[in-house]
From Swiss-Prot:
Record bears the keyword Nucleotide-binding: no
Gene Ontology BP terms: axoneme assembly; flagellated sperm motility
Site feature Essential for interaction with INCA1, where: Y117, H119
Name of the protein described by the UniProt record: Sperm acrosome-associated protein 9
One Pfam entry name: SPACA9
Organism whose genome encodes this protein: Mus musculus (Mouse)
Induction of synthesis: Expression is activated by FOXJ1 and NOTO.
Length: 168
C-alpha cells in the first residue's frame, strides 16, 4: 500500500508542475488545432491529444507540455493496474477503479467532463470557447487523482487479510 501511495504522491507532484503550465498546455492545444484545421470540435480524448502532438505540434515548448500530459495519463493508467493487483476489491473500490480506468482510457470521451470545487482548473480557462473546448481535458487529471485518493482511503479501511489476499 505504501508503494501505491508513494506513486500517487509522485504523480501529484508532476501534476502540480503541469498545473503551473496550464496556459502553455492550452496554447499548445490551440496551435495544434489550428494546424489540424480542427477548430470546431472540443478536445475529446487522450488519443486526440496524442495525435495532435505527433502530427501537428511543431514547437518544442508545446511538445514538452503535451508530452508531460501524456506521461501523467500513462502513469495514472499504470497506477490503476497496480491498484487492481493490490487486492480483489470491494464494490466501492471496484467502482472507483473502474471509473479511473475508464477516464484514463485513450479513447474515452472527455468533452463533457468538468472538475468541480475545490479544483479551479476549468475556472482558469479564459472564456466560454476555451471552457467548452478544453474543460474536459484539463479536468481529467484532478478528477482521476481524487478517485485514486478515495480508493486508497477505502482500501486502508479493509482488513489486512483482504489486502494480503490480492498479493498471493
Amino acid at each position: 500500500m505504501n508503494e501505491v501511495k508513494e506513486s500517487l504522491r509522485s504523480i501529484e507532484q508532476k501534476y502540480k508542475l503541469f498545473q503551473q503550465q496550464q496556459f502553455t498546455f492550452i496554447a499548445a492545444l490551440e496551435h495544434c488545432r489550428e494546424n489540424a484545421h480542427d477548430k470546431i470540435r472540443p478536445i475529446s480524448s487522450i488519443e486526440q491529444v496524442q495525435s495532435y502532438m505527433e502530427h501537428y505540434c511543431n514547437n518544442s515548448t508545446h511538445r514538452r507540455i503535451l508530452i508531460m500530459f501524456m506521461d501523467i495519463c500513462s502513469e495514472l493508467s499504470k497506477l490503476c493496474q497496480h491498484f487492481e493487483a493490490l487486492h480483489s476489491g470491494t464494490p466501492v473500490t471496484n467502482s472507483l477503479l473502474e471509473k479511473c480506468k475508464t477516464l484514463v482510457s485513450q479513447s474515452n470521451d472527455l468533452s463533457s467532463l468538468r472538475a468541480k470545487y475545490p479544483h479551479e482548473v476549468v475556472n482558469h480557462l479564459s472564456c466560454d470557447e476555451a471552457r467548452n473546448h478544453y474543460g474536459g481535458v484539463v479536468s481529467l487529471i484532478p478528477i482521476v487523482l481524487d478517485f485514486m485518493k478515495e480508493w486508497i482511503a477505502h482500501s486502508e479501511k479493509l482488513p489486512r487479510k483482504v489486502l494480503q489476499h490480492g498479493t498471493t
